């Protein structure tokens, strides 16, 4: 073993500097944070050659006392904390006392500073960590620091610096983050003698967003906020039309500190998931104000990461705030189509699912998707069956129909299915009286329950609510014009033209119905007359084994049938008559290709695939009654505006929009 050497101070300082000062933008970040901590309201940043030759920061903060000028450049010298306890309640940008020491050890640094109580300031000049001089000087209140020839004495680091243009871009990016984080501070970035960025410190976040981005983005924002005991979450999220193919336009600030956090990003993106198309990322600026005791910022040399005491609660708070804001914005856009009176006819005074209770074993499935959705699709999604037959009679339960007469409105062919009877025997015909659900069984002797069950899953029946009648006023001022290309439904209502994508709309209806059934452990399966045997590769079989609970809880009954071979005996009833093998393999491939292993994300994609495969397709001709039925089912959804993949289900044109297109008005 080699001899252990004690490194000299110069070497240790350069090593430490490498952790804190990665590139010129790191210098800008550390120095601007010092200015902010000093209470500056105007901060100017000047750079040359991407900051490699010169970085100059001028602020009007409190300044540094003459007696502290030398101490400011010592390692671990700081005015932010006094003891270890202070680390757990940090309210400043900096606290370690490493920045000035690290910067001055790898550059030529000049600092001038004056406090208001002194008539003169102090100037200090340091090269490579060695003080060259310290003298009195005349200067304004505040601090001016110049950093030149960065890494001049560290050739290895200098060799790996990026181009001046790249470093300039990185500095511009970090200055823009400061502008967003501190709308009350005026920032001015000067590059090669020319003004590059300028903010005015108005205190208005929207002004800052417009300064950093552009007018289009600032005019397409949705405000959100949520305030709780120890935390406040607020900010702006962009509408779908300003989404991007990358996450560059996403900013997270925790107690005004710009950080990167995968779980916060995931919370926002999951809240936006059903409103965006695939491979698109939302614009957002999110602020999290939280008591310092509940976070730890001392987890990364550059303080770019934080840890939260309770990430689960944080995730939920952020998710709920963003999701509610987006839903509110979409509802406002389609107020005339989905007006409150029409929705209340279906949703107010509670549905029977909330009114009637049944002692039913619940299957707990860990899924966190739009949990507030009020699902009532193809018929009421009743999760609590009544014990009172008279109540069933009062709400208009029809006599039980045989399965031959149960006509699935959206399925071109009658489903070839078998139910199991009380003795679990496969029925050869579908007109007997003792049907029961294929799920965790409920043994009830009330014959009316069977009638309720069949009526509920007869997709041709109307949704069952306390108010049984359809909202007649909904159709009074609505005119169904027809279909365009057997794909888009054209509707006129209140002098507005609505175009509905029939596939996307039906897909969303099926998605919410199936998701609701899974969440409630209420999935109905159909036995296949001929089980489907699928041979899988070893990799595919392993993926199935890892996720077989997802298939089971989604209504699939799958058995292992030899090595890497499976036997599918049951599939979800909602699918109608699918191509079982193609559907199963589609879900399997989605699971394989997904980077996330989050249960909720996997379930979301699996359910979306099921819904997409089962929905009506483009070029399917629909009758007027079928169109009305689809609209009725959309009325029951809490978010009917986008399909599970984020595509819009409908778009709207006002009369004014059309007259502008035809140049009738300006």
From Swiss-Prot:
InterPro entries: DNA_mismatch_repair_CS, DNA_mismatch_repair_MutL, DNA_mismatch_S5_2-like, HATPase_C_sf, MutL/Mlh/PMS, MutL/Mlh/Pms-like, MutL_C, MutL_C_dimsub. The gene is mutL. The keyword Ion transport does not apply. Coiled coil: none annotated. Disulfide bonds: none annotated. The keyword Metal-binding does not apply. GO terms for molecular function: ATP binding; ATP hydrolysis activity; ATP-dependent DNA damage sensor activity; mismatched DNA binding. Keywords: DNA damage, DNA repair. Belongs to the DNA mismatch repair MutL/HexB family. This is DNA mismatch repair protein MutL. This protein is involved in the repair of mismatches in DNA. It is required for dam-dependent methyl-directed DNA mismatch repair. May act as a 'molecular matchmaker', a protein that promotes the formation of a stable complex between two or more DNA-binding proteins in an ATP-dependent manner without itself being part of a final effector complex. One of its GO terms (biological process) is mismatch repair. It comes from the Bacteria. One of its GO terms (cellular component) is mismatch repair complex.
């Amino acid at each position: 073993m080699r001899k252990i050497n004690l490194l000299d101070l110069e070497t240790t300082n350069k090593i430490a500097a490498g952790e804190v000062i990665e590139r010129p933008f790191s210098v800008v970040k550390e120095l601007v944070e010092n200015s902010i901590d000093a209470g500056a309201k105007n901060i100017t940043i000047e750079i040359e050659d991407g900051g490699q030759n010169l970085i100059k920061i001028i602020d009007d903060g409190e300044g540094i006392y003459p007696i502290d000028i030398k101490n400011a450049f010592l390692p671990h010298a700081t005015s932010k904390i006094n003891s270890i306890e202070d680390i757990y309640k940090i309210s400043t940008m900096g606290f370690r006392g490493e920045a000035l020491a690290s910067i001055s050890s790898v550059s030529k640094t000049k600092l001038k500073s004056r406090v208001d109580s002194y008539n003169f300031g102090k100037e200090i000049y340091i090269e490579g960590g060695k003080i060259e001089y310290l003298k009195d000087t005349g200067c304004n209140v505040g601090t001016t620091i110049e950093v030149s020839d960065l890494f001049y004495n560290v050739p290895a680091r200098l060799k790996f610096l990026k181009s001046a243009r790249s470093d300039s871009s990185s500095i511009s990016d970090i200055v823009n983050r400061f502008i967003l984080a501190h709308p009350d501070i005026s920032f001015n970035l000067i590059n090669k003698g020319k003004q590059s960025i300028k903010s005015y410190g108005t205190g208005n976040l929207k002004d800052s967003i417009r300064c950093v981005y552009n007018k289009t983005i600032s005019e397409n924002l949705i405000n959100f906020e949520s305030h709780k005991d120890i935390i406040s979450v607020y900010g702006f999220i962009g509408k779908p039309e300003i989404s991007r193919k990358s996450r560059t336009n996403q900013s997270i600030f925790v107690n005004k500190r710009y950080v990167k956090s995968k779980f916060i990003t995931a919370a926002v993106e999951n809240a936006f998931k059903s409103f965006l198309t695939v491979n698109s990322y939302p614009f957002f600026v999110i602020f999290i104000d939280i008591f310092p005791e509940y976070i730890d910022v001392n987890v990364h040399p550059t303080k770019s990461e934080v840890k939260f005491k309770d990430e689960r609660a944080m995730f939920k708070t952020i998710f709920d705030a963003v999701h509610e804001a987006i839903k509110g914005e979409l509802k406002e856009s389609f107020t005339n189509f989905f007006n409150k009176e029409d929705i209340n006819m279906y949703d107010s005074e509670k549905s029977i699912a909330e009114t009637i209770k049944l002692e039913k074993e619940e299957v707990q499935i860990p899924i966190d998707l739009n949990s507030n959705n009020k699902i009532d699709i193809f018929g009421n999604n009743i999760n609590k069956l009544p014990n009172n037959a008279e109540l069933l009679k009062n709400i208009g339960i029809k006599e039980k129909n045989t399965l031959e007469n149960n006509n699935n409105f959206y399925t071109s062919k009658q489903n070839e299915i078998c139910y199991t009877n009380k003795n679990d025997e496969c029925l050869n015909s579908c007109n007997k009286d003792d049907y029961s659900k294929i799920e965790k069984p409920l043994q009830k002797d009330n014959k009316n329950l069977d009638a309720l069950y069949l009526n509920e899953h007869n997709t041709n029946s109307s949704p069952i609510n306390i108010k049984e009648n359809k909202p007649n006023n909904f159709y009074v001022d609505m005119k169904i014009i027809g279909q365009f290309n057997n794909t888009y439904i054209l509707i006129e209502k209140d002098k507005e033209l609505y175009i509905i994508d029939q596939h996307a709309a039906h897909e969303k209806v099926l998605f919410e119905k199936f998701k609701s059934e899974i969440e409630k452990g209420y999935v109905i399966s159909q036995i296949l007359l001929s089980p489907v045997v699928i041979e899988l590769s070893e990799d595919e079989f392993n993926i199935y084994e890892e996720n077989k609970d997802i298939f089971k809880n989604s209504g699939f009954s799958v058995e292992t049938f030899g090595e890497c071979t499976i036997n599918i005996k049951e599939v979800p009833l909602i699918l109608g008559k699918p191509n079982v093998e193609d559907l199963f393999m589609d879900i399997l491939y989605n699971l394989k290709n997904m980077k996330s292993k989050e249960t909720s994300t996997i379930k979301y994609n699996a359910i979306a695939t099921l819904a997409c495969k089962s929905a009506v397709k483009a070029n399917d001709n629909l009758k007027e009654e079928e169109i009305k039925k689809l609209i009725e089912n959309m009325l029951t959804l809490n978010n009917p505006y986008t399909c599970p993949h984020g595509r819009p289900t409908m778009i709207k044109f006002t009369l004014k929009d059309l007259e502008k297109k035809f140049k009738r008005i300006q």
